[in-house]
C-alpha cells in the first residue's frame, strides 16, 4: 500500500472550490480517491449538491473527522519556503489530508478499526455534522481536526449571541427635550456591559464578548427613536448564569433577544500533549454518536479565514505522526 502524499492530497482538495453550500465537487473527488485506496465509502446527502464522505474498511472503533467546506473567497494552493498556502490549507483541507495519511499508516500496520467522517457545512450551521450524527456508530473515539497548533484541545468555548434593542422618541434635534435618544440609551447599556463581572471557570477562563453590529438613527438632525446592537459572547459554563448577569446589567433599559446559543465543550485529553482552551467552535457537539471527542490539528486559527491562510508543511507532516500515534494509543486502551 503506497503512503499518502499528504501535501499532494491537500493541494488537490484546496484547488477545488468548496465554499460552504458548494461542497459537492470536492466531496466527489475525495470519495473517489478513498474508493481507489480500498475504502467502503458512503456519500451521505446533506442538502442539494452537498454531501458528506464517510469511509471505512472495517467496523470503526475510532474515527478521524473534519470538514471540507471553506469560507470565501477561494484562492488556489501554492508552496513557498516550506509553507502550503491556499483556502483551506489549515481550515481544514490540510488537516483532512493528514488524517487520511494517518489512517493509511495505521492500516498498513494492520489496524483496520479506523473510520473517516468528512463533512460539509462546518463553517455555517454544522449541517453536515448534524446529518452524520443520524448514523448509528459503534465508534468509541472521535478525533476531530481543527487548527490547534498541534495541541490537544482541553475545551472549546460556547457561543451566546443576543440583540439589544433600545426604543426612544423621535423629535427635532433642536428640541432634544421633546424626544428620547435610543442611541444614547444603547450606549449607556453597552458601557454597563464593560463593567459587568461575567461568568468564569477555573480552567476555561472568563466569558468575553464582542459588540459586532450597531444600527440606529434616521438622520443627523433627528433624535433617534430606535437603536440596536448585536453582542457575541464566547462563553464558559452554564448559560443561565450569563443570562442572569446580562439581565441584571441591562436592568430593563433595552430589549434582549437571543439569536444563537451553543454550549462550551470539554474534550478528552491524554498525557504527553500540551493542551489549550480554544475560543472557536467546532462540529464536535454535533457528532456525539461517534465517540468520546478529542480535538487536534496542524496550523493556527490566527491565519484561518485570512487572505494568507497557510500551514507549515513540517507541521502537516508532524500531524500525520501525532494522529497515528494518538489513535493507536486510544485503541490500545
Regions found by a protein language model. Name each.
Residues 24-28, 96, 243-244:
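Short, surface-exposed alpha-helical segments at coil->helix boundaries
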Residues 64, 82-125, 164-166, 176-196, ...:
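Alpha-helical metal-binding/catalytic segments enriched in His/Glu/Asp
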Amino acid at each position: 500500500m503506497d503512503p499518502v502524499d499528504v501535501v499532494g492530497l491537500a493541494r488537490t482538495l484546496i484547488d477545488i472550490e468548496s465554499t460552504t453550500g458548494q461542497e459537492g465537487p470536492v466531496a466527489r473527488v475525495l470519495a473517489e480517491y478513498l474508493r481507489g485506496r480500498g475504502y467502503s465509502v458512503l456519500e451521505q446527502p446533506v442538502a442539494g449538491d452537498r454531501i458528506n464522505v464517510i469511509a471505512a474498511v472495517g467496523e470503526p472503533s475510532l474515527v478521524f473527522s473534519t470538514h471540507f467546506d471553506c469560507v470565501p473567497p477561494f484562492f488556489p494552493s501554492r508552496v513557498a519556503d516550506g509553507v502550503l498556502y491556499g483556502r483551506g490549507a489549515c481550515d481544514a483541507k490540510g488537516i483532512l489530508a493528514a488524517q487520511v495519511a494517518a489512517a493509511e499508516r495505521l492500516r498498513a500496520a494492520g489496524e483496520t478499526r479506523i473510520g473517516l467522517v468528512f463533512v460539509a457545512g462546518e463553517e455555517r450551521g454544522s449541517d453536515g455534522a448534524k446529518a452524520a450524527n443520524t448514523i448509528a456508530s459503534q465508534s468509541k473515539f472521535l478525533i476531530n481536526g481543527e487548527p490547534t497548533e498541534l495541541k490537544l484541545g482541553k475545551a472549546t468555548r460556547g457561543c451566546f449571541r443576543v440583540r439589544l434593542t433600545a426604543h426612544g422618541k423621535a423629535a427635532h434635534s433642536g428640541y432634544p427635550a421633546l424626544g428620547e435618544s435610543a442611541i444614547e440609551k444603547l450606549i449607556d447599556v453597552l458601557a454597563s456591559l464593560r463593567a459587568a463581572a461575567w461568568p468564569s471557570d477555573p480552567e476555561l477562563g472568563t466569558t468575553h464578548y464582542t459588540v459586532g453590529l450597531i444600527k440606529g438613527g434616521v438622520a443627523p438632525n433627528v433624535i433617534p427613536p430606535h437603536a440596536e446592537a448585536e453582542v457575541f459572547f464566547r462563553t464558559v459554563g452554564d448559560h443561565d448564569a450569563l443570562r442572569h448577569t446580562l439581565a441584571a446589567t441591562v436592568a430593563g433599559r433595552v430589549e434582549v433577544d437571543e439569536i444563537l446559543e451553543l454550549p462550551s465543550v470539554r474534550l478528552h485529553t491524554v498525557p504527553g500533549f500540551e493542551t489549550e482552551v480554544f475560543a472557536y467552535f467546532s462540529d464536535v457537539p454535533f457528532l456525539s454518536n461517534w465517540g468520546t471527542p478529542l480535538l487536534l490539528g496542524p496550523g493556527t486559527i490566527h491565519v484561518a479565514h485570512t487572505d494568507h491562510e497557510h500551514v507549515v508543511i513540517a507541521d502537516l507532516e508532524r500531524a500525520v505522526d501525532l494522529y497515528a500515534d494518538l489513535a493507536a494509543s486510544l485503541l490500545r486502551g
